[in-house]
Amino acid sequence: MSQERGTTLYYGWKIVAAILFTLTFSSGLSFYNHSIYLNALAATPAFNVASASIAVSLFFFSGGLAGLLVARWVQNYDPRYCLTGGAVISAGALSALSYVTTVPQLYVVYCIFGMGFSASSLIPATTIVARWFKRRRAMALSIASTGLSLGGVILTPLCVLLVEKLSFQTAAPIMGLIYLVGVIPVSWIWLRPSPESMGLRIDGDAVDEESVPTRDTAKQDKTRPSSSAPIEDGLSFR
């Protein structure tokens, strides 16, 4: 019998809710906010629409390259470290946008921003969810990924108000701080790297009675080499 069917809510669903929350902030303050940042920059004499558009392309290019390393890293280590590092990098790059004065500076900052976004968004998020679910993985991933859209719906209008009321130079560091607060605390308070880290099984399944060793099997185990337990597939999102 699985934990999902009992009276206790399977902790994996709390993981889904936490991932939805973090994706709301990481996507809302990066992916959906490019128009806000670039409009503010293009309004200054040092930049124009063409240079700002190239910066967005560099964001996705650098994020794609970084994603190759991020995907490999999160398979072997706790994804919460990746989310934390990515949030710090993204927040720093976002804050730095208010200080750029030349086109090369803009391109460098946007490349760094893209790498931070890659490390704090979909790749580590879906990896964690996939570790907690097998039978309902598609449902869990679809719910968690809703945060990508919520970021644009909720945070983008708020960021527009910040820029209008405070100016971009003042609002950018504030948005960077919001990025940190929206990702890091939730990652360490509610996220866990795997069910095994909490003494649970994937999907909340209970331990089979057949897997509990008896006296006879215990004696047999002493006379033969031990074998490693099978590792549950789910480290990568397919």
What are the language-model segments listed below?
Residues 24, 93, 104-120:
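Hydrophobic core of transmembrane alpha-helices in multi-pass small-molecule transporters
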Residues 1-22, 225-238:
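Cytosolic juxtamembrane N-terminal segment immediately preceding the first transmembrane helix
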Residues 192-233:
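Flexible cytoplasmic inter-helical loops of multi-pass small-molecule transporters
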Residues 41, 119-133:
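Intracellular juxtamembrane helix-capping segments at the cytosolic ends
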Residues 14-49, 67-70, 156:
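Extracytoplasmic
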Residues 65-104:
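Conserved MFS/SLC helix-loop-helix module at the cytosolic interface between two early adjacent transmembrane helices
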Residues 59-64, 149-151:
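Short hydrophobic/small-residue motifs within alpha-helical transmembrane segments
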Residues 143-144, 148-198:
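Helix-loop-helix hairpin linking two adjacent transmembrane segments in secondary transporters
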